[in-house]
Amino acid sequence: MSQDLQKEVASRKTFAIISHPDAGKTTITEQLLLFGGVIRSAGTVKGKKSGKFATSDWMEIEKQRGISVTSSVMQFDYNGSRINILDTPGHSDFSEDTYRTLMAVDSAVMVIDAAKGIEAQTLKLFKVCRMRGIPIFTFINKMDRQGKMPLELLAELEEVLGIESYPMNWPIGMGKELAGIYDRYHRVIEQYRSEEDERFLPLGEDGDLKEVHAIQKSLYYDQALEEIMLLDEAGNDFSRERIIAGEQTPVFFGSALTNFGVETFLRTFVDFAPSPSSHESNEGVIEADNPKFSGFIFKIQANMNPAHRDRIAFIRICSGEFERGMNVTLTRTGKSMKLANSTQFMADDRETVNRAVAGDIIGLYDTGNYQIGDTITNGSKKLEFEKLPQFTPELFMRVYAKNVMKQKHFHKGVEQLVQEGAIQLFKTWRTEEYIIGAVGQLQFEVFEHRMRGEYNSEIRMEPIGKKIARWVKEEDADEKLSTARSMLVKDRFDQPLFLFENEFAINWFNDKNPDIELTSLL
């Protein structure tokens, strides 16, 4: 790999933003795009009344409900770095999509609501980041409102998540009393709601302001200085190595809604976030600077442009250089393909991409060739990157087309949304009626909404009273083993499994069939 290409790869910062719903994840994404010069004004995310919607919320249902249910990809340049942001679903029903997204990034930004602290979904996503060993940067949001005390939030981070924290800055007051943040890294105080020329006040060697300023009259100024002294003496030492290893999280305070502390966060993040790292494969570790092009598909999204009914497969480039028109092998099928139609996303615009390098995320127009988890490369034809996680669904519904004359629309919609990973598909063992599986109820709502809006197919869904899926070996697939509390079905790859009513039904099955092994996904 040439030095120029190595330099390009090193400039890539590819990260996901994770949070519990309503912590302000999409708002912070908007502000980052603002600093990247991609959008002129940040949309109000919950803008049902104003009619303004978040740049990263693609789908109609997202706009209506003010939540992200798909992961969007956005790219911009900032201070010599090429930033690739993946905005992930905050809602727990879409955790599978989020988990796959976390396989495609080199670091994560965890957004926490200062009033609520660590919430269930944050904890879940944090654990995946830890499992992958990727660095985690923490942004404690909504400091313009009353919330938990900063020291309490740090203690919660360390106790609940089991990770060292190092505050890069520290708030001076909060809510109505928020006066600014003390930036330990840049040695300045950033004022809240100040004139531009007064925004940053330099600190002296003693840690206090170089010149007397009105902010020192704030009720919370002296308290902030005392807390910083405490952190200097008794807090964790800053360690770049521990950050990269995912063992220490740099903590930033701010307010995404009022755009306070966000640019300071971005500037510091770019300094410390890792460049593209290596990926595990069946042929050993593939380094980002390997000259052969390789990548994997972590997401498929249909109908991003309803006018064109298009389907885009998102690929994380793991090594080498992508050039439009290049020939690659789809290793799952061994098929050779020409990558002629490719795109990149800049907020709500998309543009054809002619070249990209390791660390970049590009979209390939898909006519049905790709599946989530596919590897493409112009190197070894047997290369496969590690498998992407798949969850065992916990809710199941039979699904039918209301209008039998529109079966074609119905089948196309189900097939495409299943390929996208929006829902999981099962079929009854003999009659092959459709049963769909989801991790949470909202997935069914989105499925129904998209079938109607994107595929012109009205559907009927009926609960089947089964909640637990367990796979069996093909030789154990015997319909006689089905009971009122268990049902033999097959998945989309024709692998047999039983759907059980509850744990009691599983225990009963195990007692009766001790030689049959039941397995689950994640």
UniProtKB/Swiss-Prot annotation:
SUPFAM superfamilies reported in the protein's UniProt record = EF-G C-terminal domain-like, P-loop containing nucleoside triphosphate hydrolases, Translation proteins
Q: Its GO CC terms?
A: cytosol
Q: Which UniProt keywords apply?
A: Cytoplasm, GTP-binding, Nucleotide-binding, Protein biosynthesis
The molecular function terms in GO held by this entry are: GTP binding; GTPase activity; translation release factor activity, codon nonspecific; translation release factor activity, codon specific
Where is the protein found, in the record's own terms?
Cytoplasm
Provide the primary localization: cytoplasm
Disulfide pattern: none
GO terms, biological process: regulation of translational termination
Q: Which InterPro entries does the record cross-reference, listed alphabetically?
A: EF-G-like_DII, EFG_III/V, G_TR_CS, P-loop_NTPase, PrfC, RF3_C, RF3_dom_3_sf, RF3_GTP-bd
Source organism superkingdom = Bacteria
Q: Which residues form the tr-type G domain?
A: 10-277
Binding positions (GTP): 19-26, 87-91, 141-144
The residues forming a coiled coil are none
- UniProt similarity note: Belongs to the TRAFAC class translation factor GTPase superfamily. Classic translation factor GTPase family. PrfC subfamily.
Q: Which HAMAP family match?
A: Rel_fac_3 (MF_00072)
Give the function comment from the record. Answer: Increases the formation of ribosomal termination complexes and stimulates activities of RF-1 and RF-2. It binds guanine nucleotides and has strong preference for UGA stop codons. It may interact directly with the ribosome. The stimulation of RF-1 and RF-2 is significantly reduced by GTP and GDP, but not by GMP.
> Per its record, how is this protein called by name?
Peptide chain release factor 3
Q: What is the lineage of its organism?
A: Bacteria, Bacillati, Bacillota, Bacilli, Bacillales
